[in-house]
C-alpha cells in the first residue's frame, strides 16, 4: 500500500502525441483535461540525463554537474562517455530527503542510478554491468527483475532488426509495469516512484516511421503505429493505477526525450 503519493516518471512523454491520439488515450488525455498541465521550461541542456538528475535532486545541472551521456566539452570529435557514479546522487535525492523526514519510499528502476543503495523502503535499480540490484536484498525473490529483458539496450542496431527492436520495447514496458504493480501491491510505503523508459526509447528509434512530416518518413509502413501503441500501453497502466489506488494521489512527470 502506498499511503501518500505515487509518482510515475514516463520518460519522453510528449503532450502533442497525447493530443494526436487522444481518442485512444482516455486516461492520459483525461488527466490533462481535468487537471490541466504546467508548461515548464526545461533544464539546460534539455536532455534526459541532466533532466532526471534535476528531478531527483532539485538542483540545476550547473549545481549537480550531470550534463550529458557524453563529454560535450572534449576537443576531440569522438564519443566520450561522461562517467558519473552513484555518489553524485546518494543522500541528495528526494527519496533520501523523505527518508530523513521519516517517510519510507519505493524507488523502481530510476534512470541514472547504477548500483543503488539501501533506503528506508525498496529500491530496484536499472541494469548495470549485467545485473539489477534489489534493496533490501531479501526482497529480490519477490520481484525477480528480468535483466534479460531490461538489459538489452544496443542489441538491435540495423533497419532489418526493427521488428525485433519493437518487440523488445514492448517486452520492456511489460516488465517495468510488472515490477511497479508488484511494488504497489507489496510495499507499505509513503511514496512510490517508478521510472518508465520505453516511451522515450521507442520514439528515438521509430519517430521517422510514425511521422509523415519527418524528412526521412518512408511512407506507409508496418511500424507507423508503434509509438501510438506504446502510449496506449502506458495509458492502460495509468488507468489501472487510478482505478485501484483511489485514495492515493497520482503524479505523472516526464523529461524531454530527444
Task: State the predicted function of each range.
Residues 2-6:
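Extreme N-terminal starter segment of soluble prokaryotic enzymes
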Residues 7, 27, 229-258:
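Metal-dependent active-site segment of extracytoplasmic phospho-/sulfohydrolases and closely related
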Residues 7-9, 191-195, 251:
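Structural motif
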Residues 10-14, 33-39, 47-51, 70-83:
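Glycine-/proline-rich flexible loop or hinge segments
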Residues 11, 55, 98, 194, ...:
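A residue-level signal for conserved active-site and pocket-lining positions in enzyme catalytic cores
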Residues 18-63, 104-106:
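Short, structured active-site-proximal loop/turn typified by the sulfatase FGly-forming signature C/S-X-P-X-R
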Residues 59-218:
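His/Asp/Glu-rich, glycine-adjacent segments
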Residues 205-241:
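Extended hydrophobic/aromatic segments used for targeting, binding, or gating
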Amino acid at each position: 500500500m502506498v499511503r501518500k503519493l505515487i509518482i510515475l516518471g514516463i520518460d519522453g512523454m510528449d503532450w502533442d502525441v497525447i493530443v494526436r491520439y487522444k481518442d485512444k488515450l482516455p486516461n492520459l488525455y483525461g488527466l490533462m483535461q481535468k487537471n490541466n498541465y504546467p508548461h515548464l521550461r526545461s533544464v539546460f541542456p534539455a536532455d534526459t540525463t541532466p533532466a532526471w538528475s534535476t528531478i531527483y535532486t532539485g538542483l540545476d545541472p550547473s549545481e549537480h554537474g550531470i550534463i550529458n551521456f557524453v563529454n560535450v566539452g572534449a576537443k576531440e570529435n569522438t564519443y566520450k562517455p561522461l562517467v558519473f557514479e552513484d555518489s553524485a546522487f546518494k543522500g541528495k535525492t528526494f527519496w533520501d530527503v523523505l527518508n530523513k523526514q521519516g517517510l519510507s519510499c519505493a524507488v523502481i528502476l530510476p534512470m541514472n542510478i547504477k548500483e543503488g543503495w539501501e533506503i528506508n523502503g525498496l529500491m530496484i535499480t536499472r541494469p548495470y554491468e549485467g545485473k539489477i540490484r534489489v534493496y533490501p536484498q531479501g526482497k529480490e525473490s519477490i520481484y525477480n527483475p528480468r535483466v534479460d529483458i531490461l538489459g538489452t539496450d544496443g542489441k538491435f542496431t540495423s533497419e532489418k532488426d526493427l521488428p525485433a527492436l519493437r518487440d523488445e520495447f514492448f517486452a520492456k514496458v511489460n516488465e517495468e509495469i510488472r515490477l511497479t504493480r508488484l511494488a504497489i501491491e507489496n510495499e507499505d510505503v509513503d511514496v512510490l516512484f517508478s521510472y518508465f523508459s520505453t516511451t522515450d526509447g521507442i520514439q528515438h528509434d521509430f519517430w521517422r516511421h510514425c511521422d509523415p512530416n519527418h524528412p526521412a518518413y518512408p511512407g506507409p509502413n508496418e511500424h507507423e503505429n508503434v509509438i501510438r501503441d506504446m502510449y496506449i500501453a502506458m495509458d492502460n497502466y495509468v488507468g489501472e493505477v487510478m482505478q485501484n489506488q483511489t485514495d492515493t494521489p497520482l503524479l505523472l512527470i516526464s523529461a524531454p526525450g530527444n
